[in-house]
Amino acid sequence: MEPVEYQVILTAQAGQLFAEMKDRREQQLLLARLEKLKHEPEKQGKALSEELTGYRSIRAVGQRYRIIYQIVEDKVLVVVVGIGRRKEGDKRDVYTVTMRLLVDMMLESESDDE
């Protein structure tokens, strides 16, 4: 059986985080890592917990960057919600920024429903 190839998309926020990166070489390395997510994304990285349950994280560009994503099985889709440096304890830490963006997206979604 032919392996399934997932489509990898970035949320607007993840795309913006990627575009704001200054180092083009690091961007290229991140793109190469994103490309690998097309094949068996569920076997890559690690499952996250607590506020990010349902998401996975992989390391990129050595150990400095994290790509945070969610797999949508029924659509054969990988949705990247966060890209950035791991800076534990820093407000710009990729996990901190991603959680803030996800909360903002939920609040926007709720206000659209009203």
Predicted segments with their positions:
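A short, surface-exposed loop/turn module that caps and links secondary-structure elements
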Residues: 35-60
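Charged/polar, solvent-exposed surface patches and flexible loops
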Residues: 16, 20, 32, 36, ...
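Amphipathic alpha-helical interface surfaces
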Residues: 26, 30-33, 44, 48, ...
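Short, charged helix-to-loop "capping" segments that act as catalytic/coupling loops
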Residues: 19-27, 50-52, 60-65, 85-89
